């Protein structure tokens, strides 16, 4: 049985978000096409996603010195435990669907924090004499991103940092097959917003058949 993580980073529901509407349409279609698979939703705005801070660095330092989990402070234990939960959940899944809005040329900061929970040496990648090698082979991802302007092509494509960063990090940890659905231009062309949404939903439903 394939396990799919539906990872969202939007405080709005599908009723108030173009991206979420497309994401939920994809998941609904995927479930219809693959009823035997397990889909787990991870709402990053309602999940404990520790940032790498002084507590985390201190905990890692203690581990490097050979100390155990019991040597950590309560705050360090809570953060390390949450990070490990996020990491283990991700590692044991087969497919990943990220749904994010673009905020100031990137995605919400909680997505960056989440990726920092995942890119852990010895777990999702390893160092070799030829450089780092990703360990999560045989998995695939989909990124659905909603943007008010057009960023998939044209002069602003170079500043689509969220899309590029997510693809880079996933590739670094071994997830080299990443599909992308752009839900874009709704603010630039408000008269076409509904048309843009419907086209993206149709694209998502079609992709669900082969994802």
Swiss-Prot record:
Record-linked Gene3D superfamilies: 3.40.50.360
Co-factor binding comment: Binds 1 FMN per subunit.
Reactions catalysed: 2 a quinone + NADH + H(+) = 2 a 1,4-benzosemiquinone + NAD(+); N,N-dimethyl-1,4-phenylenediamine + anthranilate + 2 NAD(+) = 2-(4-dimethylaminophenyl)diazenylbenzoate + 2 NADH + 2 H(+)
Keyword Flavoprotein appears in the UniProt entry: yes
Residue positions binding FMN: 102-105
Keyword tags: Flavoprotein, FMN, NAD, Oxidoreductase
Cofactor requirements of the protein: FMN
One Pfam entry name: Flavodoxin_2
Record-level Gene Ontology MF annotations: electron transfer activity; FMN binding; oxidoreductase activity, acting on NAD(P)H as acceptor; oxidoreductase activity, acting on NAD(P)H, quinone or similar compound as acceptor
InterPro entries from the UniProt entry: Flavodoxin_fold, Flavoprotein-like_sf, FMN-dep_NADH:Q_OxRdtase_AzoR1, NADH:quinone_OxRdtase_FMN_depd
Enzyme Commission number: 1.6.5.-, 1.7.1.17
SUPFAM superfamilies given in the database record: Flavoproteins
Assembly and binders: Homodimer.
PANTHER family: FMN-DEPENDENT NADH-AZOREDUCTASE 1, FMN-DEPENDENT NADH:QUINONE OXIDOREDUCTASE
Function according to Swiss-Prot or TrEMBL: Quinone reductase that provides resistance to thiol-specific stress caused by electrophilic quinones.
Family to which this protein belongs: Belongs to the azoreductase type 1 family.
Listed name of the protein: FMN-dependent NADH:quinone oxidoreductase 3
Record organism: Bacillus anthracis
């Amino acid at each position: 049985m394939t396990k799919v993580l539906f990872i969202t980073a939007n405080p709005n529901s599908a009723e108030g978000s173009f991206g979420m509407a497309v994401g939920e349409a994809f998941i609904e279609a995927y479930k219809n096409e693959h009823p035997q698979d397990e889909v787990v939703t991870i709402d990053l705005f309602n999940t404990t996603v520790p940032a790498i801070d002084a507590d985390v660095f201190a905990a890692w330092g203690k581990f490097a010195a050979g100390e155990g989990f019991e040597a950590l402070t309560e705050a360090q234990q809570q953060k390390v435990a949450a990070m490990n939960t996020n990491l283990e959940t991700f590692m044991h899944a087969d497919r990943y669907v990220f749904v994010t809005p673009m905020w100031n040329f990137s995605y919400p900061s909680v997505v960056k924090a989440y990726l920092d929970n995942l890119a852990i040496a010895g777990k999702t990648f390893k160092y070799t004499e030829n450089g780092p090698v990703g360990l999560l082979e045989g998995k695939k991802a989909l990124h659905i991103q909603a943007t008010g302007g057009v960023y998939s092509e044209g002069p602003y494509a170079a500043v689509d940092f969220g899309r590029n960063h997510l693809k880079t990090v996933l590739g670094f940890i071994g997830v080299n097959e990443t599909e992308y659905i752009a839900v874009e231009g709704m603010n630039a062309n408000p008269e076409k917003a509904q048309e843009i949404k419907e086209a993206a939903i149709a694209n998502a439903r079609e992709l669900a058949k082969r994802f």
